[in-house]
Each structure stands twice: as C-alpha cells, then as structure tokens.
Amino acid sequence: MSTDTIPSLSSPPAPEFPSTTPDTATSPAPSQPSIIGPSSLAPFPETTTNIDGGSRNVALTGLITGVVLGATFVLLGVCIFVCFYKRKKRKLKKKKKEDIEASINRDSLDPKDDSNNLQQWSSSEIGQNLFTYEDLSKATSNFSNTNLLGQGGFGYVHRGVLVDGTLVAIKQLKSGSGQGEREFQAEIQTISRVHHRHLVSLLGYCITGAQRLLVYEFVPNKTLEFHLHEKERPVMEWSKRMKIALGAAKGLAYLHEDCNPKTIHRDVKAANILIDDSYEAKLADFGLARSSLDTDTHVSTRIMGTFGYLAPEYASSGKLTEKSDVFSIGVVLLELITGRRPVDKSQPFADDDSIVDWAKPLMIQALNDGNFDGLVDPRLENDFDINEMTRMVACAAASVRHSAKRRPKMSQIVRAFEGNISIDDLTEGAAPGQSTIYSLDGSSDYSSTQYKEDLKKFKKMAFESKTFGSSECSGLTSDNGQNPSGSSSITEGQRTTQEIEPEKNTKDT
C-alpha cells in the first residue's frame, strides 16, 4: 500500500485557553468579591425602595400630627368654653345681686323688674320652696284678721294651712319698705343655709310684684316674752326656764361657731325666742342677721337691735359682733332669773332703768355669798335648783361684761349650763361689774357712764322719730298682735332703725 493512500494521522489542534497571567499593562485591577453574592447579580432597586418607605413615614407622621393637633384644638376649645361659661355665670350672679341691692335702696319698687330679678336670684341661690301669692292667700283665708298672729314695724304675721295640711306662719312685709326689703334678703340668705333644732325653719317664700312673704314652720307655744311678761299668765316653772335658756344658747352657739361663715344674729331678745309645746326654744327673726364677713368691716349708720339688749360697744362704735349677741343673751338670762323686763318702762331715762345696771350688784352678792334674795323672780317662791341658779347667774354675769373680748363664747355658756366647766373657768376670776373696758383694741376710755349717756341719746332720737318699728318676726306666735314687742314703746323692747351716725368715742378697728 502506497503511502499516498494512507491517511495521515495528525493531532487535533490544541484548544486555546485564555492566559492566566494578567496583563498588568492593560487589565484593570480585580475588584473585591461581594459579601452578598456574585458580582453578576443585579443590584436592588434602592431608589424605588426609599421612595415607598418615605411615603409611608410621611403618611404616618401626618396622621399622628393631625390627631394631636385635633385633640389640642378640642381641649383648647373646651377650656375656652368653660372659662367663658364661668365668667358669664359670675357676671350674671353679680348682676343679680346688684339688682337686688338696687331694689332694696329704692323707695318705690318696680314690681315687674324687681320680681323677675329677685325670683331668678332666689331660685338659683336659695333653693327654697317658691310659693305663689294665691297659695298663701288661700292658706290664710285671704290674710284674714282671724288668722293674724302679730304685727311689727315692717309687716304682719298670719297663721296658715298649706294644701298638704302643714301649719305655717307667714310673714308679709309691708310693700315699698326699704328696710323690709333688706330684712327679706337677710332672712332668706341666712336662715335658708342654717339648720338646727333650736333655730326656726324657713319653709319657703313668695315674690309677687312688690309683695314679699316668708313662710316659716309654725311654733305653737308663742314666745318667751309672752310667757314671762304677759299679764295674768301662770308663773313659768324654773325647770322650763332652764330648758329654754339652754336651747337658746345652743342655737346661738351654732350660728357663731358651726356655721361657715359664722352668723351674727344682731337682735337676740325674749320676743325672738319661740317655744314649742315641749318648751324647746327656737331662735327666730334673722332680719338683721349678717355673716361675719360683713360684720368685720361693717359700721351701721342705723340704730339696729332692741333697746335694753344692745351691747355697750354698739353705742360707741356702731359695730355688732358675736360678742354683742352674747351680751344680748345675757340680758335674756337676766329676764329668766328675775322675771323683769330688760328696760323699766316707767323710767325710760333713769340711770338704773336697765336690768343690767339693776342686777349687777345683786349678782355680785349672790355669787359671793350664795344669797339670791332680791335677785330671783319672787314668783318662783324659791322653788329652784340652787346649783342651776348659780350657773345661770354666773353665765348672765359673764355675758353682760362691758369688755366685749372678756365675754365668754356661746359654746362656753352651753358647757357651763350643762355643768361641763366650772364657774371659775367661766368668770376668769372677774366679778360682775368690775370690767368697764369694752373696746376690742384695748382702750379704756369708754365707761358704763358714757354708755348710759349714749343710750339715752339713742332713746331720745327714737322717741322723736316716727319711723321706728318693732321686730315683726317676734309676732310669729302671738295672738292678734298682743305681743308687747308690737307696741310703739321702745322701753318695752322696741327695735328702731332711725338713721344716725354713732359717735366714735373709741378707735374703730
């Protein structure tokens, strides 16, 4: 076989492999390997992801901001509304009070305006029952004289029966009386907020045009004045006198020390102490009463109160405080002890016409030697408990001291009656009549002699006046106006309201 026909065996061409030796002159430097995968993987669309997340954040932030702003605006609106409402309410309250004061100071009343103003003020501030004039007219048989209990300087008192059968005493103030309007306001402001078994209860009121009426609980057994001083009355037993004294003292102690603010009665007297069938005492007639917030700065330019019961400091300074009430209750105690009136009507200008001046030397003697002859009501015929009499005389003596700040508190009087403190604690070692200082600032230039001179001046002015009047509420239980307090004589315990300016014999505090 020739060689031409034999295919030649040749090696296949060697494959070409890229060179593993980099050309440093032309090849770029190798990059660092990626930690998340091969370099050939497509990158995440970072730009698109940032846009979506930002939108969600903006939306969430906007939502939170809207909620916060909305809540803030709502809260702010509520605060503004509350502030505006309270401010408006204060203005309305102030305006109502100003309207009342304006109506009080006017000589003639505008029935339409004053009725509306007083009704709005009373119903919102007092909260007592509001009666119509027709209700009360029907209850008293058209204010018949047969139902007349008594009358005073500013009105009449009738017995009445309400629709539900409740027996009441209805005080009708004289129309157009400025003082009567003041007393109406004082009564509903004072007695509507005090509640005590020894204070008469106010059941409601009526305002119709110029008519002003007050509705009280009916106290059936008349007044202390009636039982002590009315002619042909049986002698009041000592035990009943003691019970009445304790009850009246408790009622006054409540006004002075348990009320907030404390209340000064300013017309404590036997005619204003009502008695029920059990001979429990109820203090009545708050027409002159004031809270301590008023009396701290108030100087009266009218003679307020009742002659024979007025405290010495009032004759000089024109101020009445709780210690003035204490003096007045001391006079009532002397009436219970002696059976005498506070002023001797047969000697209205005598030096010793006052029960206080008459009784002081006798009280000194009685407390020193235990001899009550000449001091105690002879109608008792020595039928009394000697220990109770000693305590009552000691209470009376301490209460009528000329020095107002040395008079005891009413709570001390109550404890002394109950035997819970000694007489020495009550009297503080001072005999009746020893103290002539009365002024609260400690000055000593006002004596009992000067007091008598001032009191004479007051009496003379009241006798010459045609406008003085008595305590109308003292007739709450007296029949047909026969209660002596309804007479025109100030020597029988007459209240007067003549305008004067008391002389300032001491420094006013």
UniProtKB/Swiss-Prot annotation:
Residues 468-499 have a biased composition (Polar residues). Gene3D superfamilies: Phosphorylase Kinase, domain 1 (3.30.200.20), Transferase(Phosphotransferase) domain 1 (1.10.510.10). The chain crosses the membrane at residues 62-82. The keyword ATP-binding applies. ATP binds at L149, G150, Q151, G152, G153, F154, G155, Y156, V157, K171. GO terms for cellular component: plasma membrane. The modification Phosphotyrosine is found at Y216, Y314. Residues 18-34 have a biased composition (Low complexity). It comes from the Eukaryota. It is found in: Cell membrane. The keyword Oxidoreductase does not apply. GO terms for molecular function: ATP binding; protein serine kinase activity; protein serine/threonine kinase activity. The modification Phosphothreonine is found at T132, T301, T306. The active site is at D267. This is Proline-rich receptor-like protein kinase PERK15. The lineage of its organism: Eukaryota, Viridiplantae, Streptophyta, Embryophyta, Tracheophyta. The gene is PERK15.
